[in-house]
Every structure is written in C-alpha cells, then in structure tokens.
Amino acid sequence: MWCLAITGPPGAGKSTLARKVVEELKKAGLKVCGTSCPDVREGGRRVGFLIVDVEDGSRAWLARVDCEGPRVGRYKLCPGAEEVGVRALSKDCDVYLIDEIGPMELKLPKLREAMLRVVSGNKPFVAVYHARLRDEEFLRALSRCHKIFVTKDTREEAWKEALEALSSFSP
C-alpha cells in the first residue's frame, strides 16, 4: 500500500507540496478525496482556518478566534467542521488527502477517528502532519509511509523526492 507523509515547520511548503502531488494523481485519472485546512487572513492577519472537502469544495470553519468550541492556541473550534471532514474522508476514492493532522483536527473526536481510519487502512493516501505530532497511533500508522521533511530551503528537493515516490505508485 502506497502512502506519502509530509512534515516540516510552519510555512515550509508542506501543503503546497501535497497540492502538487494531488494534481499529479488527478492528471493520472485518479479520484482524490479528503481534506485541506487552509488558513484565512483578513487584512494580512490570520483569523482562522477552514476545512475543505477537496473533492466537492464544500467547506466550514474549522477554527476562528470568535467560535464557541474548545480552544486550541488562540483559536476556538467551530461547529460544522467535523461533519465536513468526516464526510470527505468517508467517500470511496482511489487516493485520500489529509492536510493536516494537527492539534485542531485531532481535538475533534469524529474527525480524529476518520483520519485514523484512513492512515491505518489499505487505501493509498497523502498526509501532511504537524512537525510536533506526538499521537502514538498516528505516528505508528505514518511510519509505514515514505516520509518527506520539507523546509523553506529544501522545497525543490522535496518536490523531486515526491515525484520519485509517485513513480512507485500503482493504484
């Protein structure tokens, strides 16, 4: 079973690399499902994060400074995020994307369960994970994957490594 695990410090280009890998998979005719959690900025200042279903584009706020849910750092989790994420990761696809496995996503029990089901399963996936991930279940599941550590200085090398990993992929 093929999987790619991408990690590195914030702002290194992990999500960009994952997006490029997904584009290559789609060009090969594969159906990719899963989640992406981009940040949202207003006036140059980050105000929160969305959770987006990468297959159909549906979205909800994952966390904002003004939501009502549990706090993670300076943000609070928002209602509706879990539903979008679980639905996206429950679809029947050729390859799954999880961007990212981080503190906010892991704080939502049903989303955590859906992400763990994907990374522990038998379907191919691409996962971006927080560099300080300490969750043993996820670390164990990701240990079977080809890992790429991205930094601002190694983005080009990381892309070459991802292309090499893609060359060994067969659906």
Curated annotation (Swiss-Prot):
Organism listed in the record: Ignicoccus hospitalis (strain KIN4/I / DSM 18386 / JCM 14125)
Enzyme class, first EC level, given as a word: hydrolase
Entries under PANTHER family matching the protein: CANCER-RELATED NUCLEOSIDE-TRIPHOSPHATASE
Keyword terms: ATP-binding, Hydrolase, Nucleotide-binding
The keyword ATP-binding appears for this protein: yes
Name the UniProt record assigns to this protein: Nucleoside-triphosphatase THEP1
UniProt binding sites for ATP: 8-15, 95-102
Catalytic activity entry: a ribonucleoside 5'-triphosphate + H2O = a ribonucleoside 5'-diphosphate + phosphate + H(+)
UniProt KW Chloroplast keyword: no
Entry EC number(s): 3.6.1.15
Family named by the database record: Belongs to the THEP1 NTPase family.
GO molecular function: ATP binding; ATP hydrolysis activity
Source organism, top-level taxon: Archaea
SUPFAM superfamilies named among the record's database cross-references: P-loop containing nucleoside triphosphate hydrolases (SSF52540)
Pfam family, one: NTPase_1
Role summary: Has nucleotide phosphatase activity towards ATP, GTP, CTP, TTP and UTP. May hydrolyze nucleoside diphosphates with lower efficiency.
